[in-house]
Amino acid sequence: MSLSGSFDTMPLPELLSWLDTTARSGRLTIDSLRAGTTLVVDNHRITGCQSSEPPTLLGQFLLFHGAISEETLQVAMREQDRNGRRLGEILLDGGSISAEVLDGFLAAKAEETILSTFDVADARFDFDGDTRPPRGVLPVSMPIHFVIAKGLRRIEETAEAALFLEQRGQLLRRTDRRPSPRIGAVWPLRQAYEAVNGARTVEEIALHVHGTRAQVLQRLYELYKEGYIELATPERSVALLLPPSILEEPLTSINVSAELPSLVPRRIADDATALNSVERYLLSRCDGTKDVRSIAMVAPIRPWEVADTIRSLLSRGLLEVGRRPAG
């Protein structure tokens, strides 16, 4: 039996409960503006998952938890582009991560992929009885009733955190309280703390730390309740100190699409008041040291969106792009 609809008419908890009580087996596909996710269901359990949402992809998930560096991810993804091997295999063979640690992160990634479907309020779904796992699916074994319980708790916790942290006209800044040893020891908590600068929204902070909104809100709320960060009215932005340009022959023409991946973008304007979170994030990465391809490899954004956004920033005079000097 197949079933199609939207979360407006059948919310995710209700949909999963129906799959559980009727002991259905098959594929549940959830499509939103943000991403597409497939869950493989088999007799009261979710046995596989797959998502196109950037923060739930393996490389971004490992960055969020501090398991690898951005430089390591860039090298691995360049090798993946050359030979098509799986990212995990490349990281293992290169000694960047052990098999035991990778297995642990894959299990955690699978759970986050499944639970992140509860972050989506507006989506369409399609369930069919095809039990064959799609290519690239991540195996998992989670009882559906367990997923529903954790998902509902996630919704409540995220809503509570957002109620306190996302106030109109106010942004998060650090307080004078000295960071605890735990903040220094827990990578996602430390990164969330360091990303708070009095000028970034929660969405921007999530981009900088490579996490989902729910993951980041959880860490920020912990920091907020313990007095390490606070809400404040943002002050007038301070002019950005830009390094000297290293670009050879900066290009002023907008028609650079074919060459864009190999070009190096550099921010040349400070006014970011009319920009969205993705634009501000990418502007912060355009420091004249990395080409567009390298930025796209580590950004928690789809590559085409990186390219489109950089083209837009270029056309508005906020960036220059050029070639690296030879040699």
Residue spans of the language-model regions?
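Acidic, Ser/Thr/Pro-enriched low-complexity segments and adjacent helix/loop capping patches
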Residues: 1-327
